[in-house]
Each structure stands twice: as structure tokens, then as C-alpha cells.
Curated annotation (Swiss-Prot):
The modification N6-(pyridoxal phosphate)lysine is found at residue 230. Gene3D superfamilies: Aspartate Aminotransferase, domain 1, Type I PLP-dependent aspartate aminotransferase-like (Major domain). Its cofactor is pyridoxal 5'-phosphate. Pathway: One-carbon metabolism; tetrahydrofolate interconversion; Amino-acid biosynthesis; glycine biosynthesis; glycine from L-serine: step 1/1. NCBIfam families: PRK00011.1 (NF000586). PROSITE patterns: SHMT. GO terms for cellular component: cytosol. It is found in: Cytoplasm. Belongs to the SHMT family. (6S)-5,6,7,8-tetrahydrofolate binds at residues 122, 126-128. This is Serine hydroxymethyltransferase. Catalyzes the reversible interconversion of serine and glycine with tetrahydrofolate (THF) serving as the one-carbon carrier. This reaction serves as the major source of one-carbon groups required for the biosynthesis of purines, thymidylate, methionine, and other important biomolecules. Also exhibits THF-independent aldolase activity toward beta-hydroxyamino acids, producing glycine and aldehydes, via a retro-aldol mechanism. Keywords: Amino-acid biosynthesis, Cytoplasm, One-carbon metabolism, Pyridoxal phosphate, Transferase.
Length: 415
């Protein structure tokens, strides 16, 4: 028997407890601007830490290979129903353990090794699972990539011409470092014109889409994949939305195709996050996410930094650092020293190596969760510029760090 009072983390494993405590303090003390990170609610974390972690449940609600699944069936069905409502989808699979596995599930359902797929170039803002050479998608399939035009928007004309020429079996839309609105309807029509499947990976934009502040790809795509964290503010995991005609193939591809028993405690966390995302408060939050990103981008441009594409229409932006004569790797380090967390990121046609880069990627979801509004977003942008204007002055870094501390104390993550 486990006595709850005796089996606490601090008593059983002080080393892990200490690391958790330090990470909690880091999250409170640092301004988080990594676009793919956010803070889950205590309710989501409670679901993930529940007894549901004990239950094996291979299969799907009502069709399990294990007994004792009557309550986890309720949990999974709620997650399915809520995510369908959230995005207006005909069918959904909530079992993928990650966004990458959601993408793999679609590939396993409709592709064979050697088939041609078409996705956005990683170097111009795409994602490694959309055909990057070292990824499974690049090793198993013949990959053709589309990119950006001179205005650093997706080159839809070139995309269409390439699709007509190469006739891919699957066209993928979605990005990990692209700030503008994606014309899912147009790409969907291109896919339909050549008889290709159309998959959208909306992992970065899912929260915005749920709130109606970014175009919804669901009406235009055969498959829509997403993570459940990032802007959606749920647990780390994945989901596949699909047309009803593809439900059987996708379900078989996930189980038994590429996964075994689902993580029921994570699915519970997903269900809670979907309920939160259906609320009016979540819509207001996402509206503020977009406002904060725009305010930050405008301020950075006023301070002499170039924003790739000239603006942001979402939660994310790429900052070209070459005018400041600093690399993305260096900027990530000095901003981190000032307690502003960012990630280095390649810009289009980047002359630097991928581990060095000429840019950083910034996102507004996490700071907006803290309660930051436009005024704070402007302050944060000025603090970033202050660091980049004088990155090797320790007194300057210390002064910025002190100003960051004032903001983080005023806006705690978990009050």
C-alpha cells in the first residue's frame, strides 16, 4: 500500500525534487519567448498526475483489448468530442504521443515508402517532419519542397507549378517558423487539382485557430495534425483531425500501426485543455497573444531589427540579427543571461550554420499566459533590443535582468 504522506517526491527522490523546484523557479523568473512553449493550467497538470497513468487501454473507446476500461473510455471520448467541437472536425484521434507521431500516423495511413510528398522547406520555415533529409519523412519518401517569394511569404504560384510538375501523393502545409497567415484554402485546391491528399500541420497555430484569430484549415484538408501544447496550452502530445472517410485508416495507423497503449493520463490532460480552449476566456487570451506579438514586432523594428516577412500575423516572429552583428547562438546566450528565454533560428537563405544561425525566433503565448498585455510586450521588446545593442557589457545585462525581475514578480505564472 502507498501511504500518500510517505510517498511524496521530496521524501522518495530529493534529487529529482530539487531539479523540479529549480525549474519551477526558472519558469517564474524568466520571460519565456520560445514560440513552442507555454504554461499549462494546474487542472491540466492534475490530470496528468492522476491514477490514469496506471491504466493500459490498447484500442479505442468501446473496443479495448484490456478489461477495466469503462472510465478511461469516458475520458478519451470526452477528449474526442471536445476537440471535434473546438475545430469543427468530422473525426479525431487523440492518441498520438506527439506532433511528430501524429504526422507519422498520417504517413503510415496513406503513403508507401518511395511516394512523393511536398512540404515547406525547413530552411525557409517548415518543420523537420515535412521532409527534412535526416528525418524519417526524408528517408522514406521522395521529397519536393516549396518556399518563400521575395516578400518572404509562401510562393503559392511556385508551389502550384511544382505540384503540377511533380504530382506528389501528399501536400503538407504548416510551419515552425513562419509568421504570416497561410492560405490553406488555396493549397487545398492545388492538392485537389492533382488528386493529392492534403495534410495541414497546425501545431504552432492551433490555439489561435481554436479561437478564430487565424484561418482554420479543417474545412480544406483531408488531415490536420497538431500538438496539444504550444499555443493550445495543453499537455505535450498530439492529435489528428480528419474527414470521416479517413477515420478507420487513421485509427488503424495509430493503433496498432505505430503505437501501443495510449497514455490515458495525457489524454485526460488533453480533454481538460480542450474544455479550457472552448471558453470565452481562451478566445480573449488568443486575441491578446496576437496583439502582443504585433506590439513586440513593431517595437523591435523601431529599434533597428528586421522582422522576417516585415510583420507578424500570428504569435510568432523571426528576428534577423545581422544588423546587430550578432549570431542567433550568441543572442540566445546573452538574452538568457538577462533571463529572457529565446531560441536561435535560421532565417531564409541564412549564411550561418544551423547551430549558429543569423536569427532568433520569438513567440508571445507564454508571456501572454502570465498576463502581459501590449504595454508589457513593448517593454520586453525594448529589453531585448537593449541587450542586443550592448551584448558584452555585464552591467547592461544585469540592468536588464533587474527589469525582467520586476515584470516577472508583477506577473507570476502560478500565483
Amino acid at each position: 500500500m502507498f501511504e500518500r504522506s510517505r510517498y511524496t517526491i521530496d521524501q522518495i527522490d530529493p534529487e529529482i525534487f530539487a531539479a523540479i523546484q529549480k525549474e519551477n523557479q526558472r519558469q517564474e523568473d524568466h520571460i519565456e519567448l520560445i514560440a513552442s512553449e507555454n504554461y499549462t493550467s494546474p487542472a491540466v497538470m492534475a490530470a496528468q498526475g492522476s491514477q490514469l497513468t496506471n491504466k493500459y487501454a490498447e484500442g479505442y473507446p468501446g473496443k479495448r483489448y484490456y478489461g477495466g476500461c469503462e472510465y478511461v473510455d469516458v475520458v478519451e471520448q470526452l477528449a474526442i468530442d471536445r476537440v471535434k467541437q473546438l475545430f469543427g472536425a468530422e473525426a479525431a484521434n487523440v492518441q498520438p504521443n506527439s506532433g511528430s507521431q501524429a504526422n507519422q500516423g498520417v504517413f503510415f495511413a496513406v503513403l508507401k515508402p518511395g511516394d512523393t510528398i511536398m512540404g515547406m522547406s525547413l530552411a525557409e520555415g517548415g518543420h523537420l517532419t515535412h521532409g527534412m533529409a535526416l528525418n524519417m519523412s526524408g528517408k522514406w519518401f521522395n521529397v519536393v519542397s516549396y518556399g518563400l517569394n521575395a516578400q518572404e511569404d509562401i510562393d503559392y504560384d511556385a508551389l502550384e507549378a511544382l505540384a503540377q510538375e511533380k504530382k506528389p501523393k501528399l501536400i503538407i502545409a504548416g510551419a515552425s517558423a513562419f509568421a504570416l497567415r497561410i492560405d490553406f484554402e488555396r493549397i487545398g485546391k492545388i492538392a485537389k487539382s492533382i488528386g493529392a491528399y492534403f495534410m495541414v500541420d497546425m501545431a504552432h497555430y492551433a490555439g489561435l485557430i481554436a479561437a478564430g484569430v487565424y484561418p482554420n484549415p479543417v474545412p480544406h484538408a483531408d488531415f490536420v495534425t497538431t500538438t496539444t501544447h504550444k499555443s493550445l496550452r495543453g499537455p505535450r502530445g498530439g492529435v489528428i483531425l480528419m474527414k470521416a472517410e479517413h477515420e478507420k485508416a487513421i485509427n488503424s495507423a495509430i493503433f496498432p500501426g505505430i503505437q501501443g497503449g495510449p497514455l490515458m493520463h495525457v489524454i485526460a490532460g488533453k480533454a481538460v485543455a480542450f474544455k479550457e480552449a472552448l471558453s470565452p476566456e481562451f478566445k480573449a487570451y488568443q486575441e491578446q497573444v496576437v496583439k502582443n506579438a504585433a506590439a513586440m514586432a513593431e517595437t523591435l523594428m523601431a529599434r533597428g531589427l528586421r522582422i522576417v516577412s516585415g510583420r507578424t500575423e500570428s504569435h510568432v516572429m523571426l528576428v534577423d540579427l545581422r544588423a546587430k552583428k550578432i549570431t542567433g547562438k550568441e543572442a540566445e546566450k546573452v538574452l538568457g543571461d538577462a533571463h529572457i528565454t529565446v531560441n536561435k533560428n535560421a532565417i531564409p537563405n541564412d549564411p550561418e550554420k544551423p547551430f549558429v544561425t543569423s536569427g532568433v525566433r520569438l513567440g508571445s503565448p507564454a508571456m501572454t499566459t502570465r498576463g502581459f498585455k501590449e504595454a508589457e510586450a513593448v517593454k520586453v521588446a525594448h529589453l531585448i533590443a537593449d541587450v542586443l545593442d550592448n551584448p558584452h557589457d555585464e552591467a547592461n545585462i544585469a540592468a536588464v535582468r533587474a527589469k525582467v525581475a520586476e515584470l516577472t514578480k508583477q506577473f507570476p505564472v502560478y500565483g
